[in-house]
Structure formats: structure tokens, C-alpha cells
């Protein structure tokens, strides 16, 4: 009988440990999801800024002088 009680107690401890682990993993997942959403927002903002940059086309006949360090 004591063996069964010890087994039950051990199982209860394992379940409690697993519940704690699941809770910690859930918190980490929520934090990562928030970070991912922020990074997606920031990336979208950067993409929009890059699209706004006026890049001259390669069709220009002007030859740019070399940079001063040459």
C-alpha cells in the first residue's frame, strides 16, 4: 500500500513540474509572439521607407565623378 502511495506522490510531483514547465513555455511563446509582431511591423516600415527612396535610373547619360578617396 505504501508503494502505491509513493508512486501516486511521485506522479503528482511530475504533473506539478510539467504544469510549471508548460506555464513557462507559454510565457516564452507569448513573449516571442509579441517580439515577432514588433519585428514584422518594423520590417514593413523599413520596406516602405526604402520604396520611398528616389533612386536614379541607370538610363542617365551623366557620368558621376569618382569618390574623393580615389
UniProtKB/Swiss-Prot annotation:
It comes from the Bacteria. InterPro entries: SlyX. Disulfide bonds: none annotated. Gene3D superfamilies: 1.20.5.300. It holds the Pfam family SlyX. PANTHER family: PROTEIN SLYX. HAMAP family: SlyX. Belongs to the SlyX family. This is Protein SlyX homolog. It comes from Pseudoalteromonas atlantica (strain T6c / ATCC BAA-1087). The lineage of its organism: Bacteria, Pseudomonadati, Pseudomonadota, Gammaproteobacteria, Alteromonadales.
Amino acid at each position: 500500500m505504501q508503494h502505491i502511495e509513493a508512486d501516486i506522490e511521485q506522479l503528482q510531483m511530475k504533473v506539478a513540474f510539467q504544469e510549471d514547465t508548460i506555464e513557462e513555455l507559454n510565457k516564452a511563446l507569448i513573449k516571442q509572439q509579441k517580439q515577432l509582431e514588433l519585428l514584422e511591423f518594423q520590417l514593413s516600415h523599413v520596406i516602405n521607407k526604402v520604396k520611398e527612396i528616389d533612386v536614379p535610373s541607370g538610363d542617365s547619360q551623366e557620368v558621376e565623378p569618382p569618390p574623393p578617396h580615389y
